[in-house]
């Protein structure tokens, strides 16, 4: 579990177009840092629909039972434990994620499957996953990102001030 540093969350969320966000998923949610940052950031905007009372539109997935308990205690709906075997008919307009770097490619590919047409996925990944597509899943991810016209930004040292270092 590597909490997303606020600086990285800010950069990740700066690229989100909130105009058409109807549903949010945070897979591998940890303590819900990304979604909480998004709520704080947008809660001050009068015309933004997300605030504490709208948590019915937000789903979280978390494999660690202690972290699931924290999410539930914060009022978040936890819909599943292992994101890689989370299947639902629901499609999300926004997926915010900081998946485990070891399987980041698989997590991002699965997120693309759960994203509605025209939706957005904002993801923190190890740069090596993108720069070195040596596995079949990384090659597929590279093709999918090109197909979707994904915007990729590389941030050096993004986790050097985090609670847990990468």
Predicted regions and their residues:
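Class I S-adenosyl-L-methionine-dependent methyltransferase catalytic core
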Residues: 1-166
């Amino acid at each position: 579990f590597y909490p997303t540093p606020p600086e990285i969350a800010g950069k990740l969320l700066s690229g989100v177009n909130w105009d058409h966000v109807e549903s949010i998923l945070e897979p591998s949610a940890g303590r819900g840092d990304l979604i909480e940052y998004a709520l704080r950031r947008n809660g001050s905007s009068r015309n933004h629909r997300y605030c504490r009372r709208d948590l019915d539109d937000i789903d979280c997935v978390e494999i660690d039972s202690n972290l699931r308990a924290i999410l539930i205690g914060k009022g978040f709906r936890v819909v599943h434990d292992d994101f890689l075997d989370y299947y639902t008919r629901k499609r999300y307009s926004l997926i915010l994620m900081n998946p485990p770097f070891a399987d980041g490619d698989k997590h991002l590919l699965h997120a693309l499957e759960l994203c509605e047409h025209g939706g957005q996925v904002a993801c923190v990944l190890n740069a090596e996953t993108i720069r070195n597509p040596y596995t079949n899943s990384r090659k597929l991810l590279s093709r999918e990102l090109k197909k979707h016209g994904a915007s990729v930004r590389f941030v050096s040292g993004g986790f050097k001030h985090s609670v847990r270092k990468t």
